[in-house]
């Protein structure tokens, strides 16, 4: 890539991140959150983590758009494509944030009009949603044959799978995951973070390895890849947890001892296995 194009794309990336931050700040301000005051004035780690995850997710989508734009013909076409999909990424990331509050972390958001965001466990989970969504967007936006509709469709599939996977995991655990996160138990948050990031990686790989043909054939191919990957991730995750944490009762370590180390190992096991599975299946 020529140096002048590289400089233009870097400027466009910074402009996109600035626009994304402004859009999120305006939206949260309507709910009683003043992000800059929380981060700088109150030194809220939770507010900083959730904002950082959101910006990383935005940048991941931007990188996907660039990988396709590199094959575009003409300077204006490339810049326009990146700008369009950058704006799409902002809208979808903000939507994902709203959906996670309603479907994944229901009841954990501070009431409207309050100015506190100190629950780090909740913030880590929301940051994971943003990053996982960014991975899905990076995969869909890097496809030269896909448009905005296809990108939105993959986004919808990704959000549905995230909700289903987390709710399924919560049904398996002998404790109330949301109650523990509400208590700011970071140990209970990390397994959910691992699941979300693992799904983001799997979804990105599914988009990248989809078959050629009609939209129905593409959906069937992607669905088959996702199904096999999710089953293998769950099976190998059970094996990995036995290796990483032998003779340890995770529920007791997470709830009673509030062991962040145990929760982190649980979450990492999902992430490690998803990397292995997607590498060999893609």
Features from the language model and the residues they span:
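A generic, lipid-embedded transmembrane alpha helix
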Residues: 45-67, 128-134, 193-205
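Membrane-interface helix termini and inter-helical loops of multi-pass transporters
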Residues: 67-76, 140-149, 177-178, 207-219, ...
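Alpha-helical transmembrane segments
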Residues: 1-18, 76-93, 146-162, 217-233
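Membrane-interface helix-loop-helix junctions at boundaries between adjacent transmembrane segments
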Residues: 74-88, 97-125, 145-149
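Alpha-helical transmembrane segments and their immediate juxtamembrane interface regions
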Residues: 84-109, 160-183, 228-250
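Juxtamembrane boundary at the C-terminal end of a transmembrane helix
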Residues: 274-282
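Membrane-interface helix-loop junction between the first two transmembrane segments
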Residues: 19-41, 173
């Amino acid at each position: 890539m020529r140096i002048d194009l590289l400089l233009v794309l870097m400027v466009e990336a910074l402009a996109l991140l600035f626009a994304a931050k402004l859009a999120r700040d305006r939206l949260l301000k309507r709910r009683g959150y003043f992000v800059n005051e929380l981060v700088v004035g109150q030194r809220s780690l939770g507010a900083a983590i959730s904002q950082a995850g959101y910006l990383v997710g935005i940048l991941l989508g931007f990188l996907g758009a660039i990988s396709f734009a590199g094959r575009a013909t003409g300077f204006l076409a490339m810049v326009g494509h990146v700008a369009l999909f950058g704006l799409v990424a902002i809208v979808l990331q903000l939507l994902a944030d709203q959906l996670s509050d309603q479907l994944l972390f229901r009841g954990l958001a501070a009431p409207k009009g309050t100015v506190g965001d100190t629950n780090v466990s909740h913030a880590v989970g929301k940051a994971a949603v943003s990053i996982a969504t960014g991975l899905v967007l990076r995969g869909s936006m890097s496809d030269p044959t896909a448009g905005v509709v296809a990108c939105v469709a993959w986004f919808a599939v990704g959000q549905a799978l995230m909700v289903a996977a987390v709710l399924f995991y919560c049904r398996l655990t002998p404790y109330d995951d949301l109650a523990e996160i509400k208590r700011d138990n970071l140990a209970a948050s990390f397994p959910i973070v691992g699941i979300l990031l693992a799904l983001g990686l799997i979804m990105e790989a599914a988009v990248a390895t989809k078959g050629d043909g009609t939209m129905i054939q593409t959906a069937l191919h992607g669905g088959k890849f996702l199904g096999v990957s999710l089953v293998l991730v769950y099976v190998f995750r059970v094996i990995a947890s036995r290796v990483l944490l032998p003779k340890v009762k995770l529920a007791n370590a997470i709830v009673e001892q509030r062991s962040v180390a145990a929760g982190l190992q649980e979450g990492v096991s999902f992430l490690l296995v998803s990397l292995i599975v997607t590498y060999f299946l893609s």
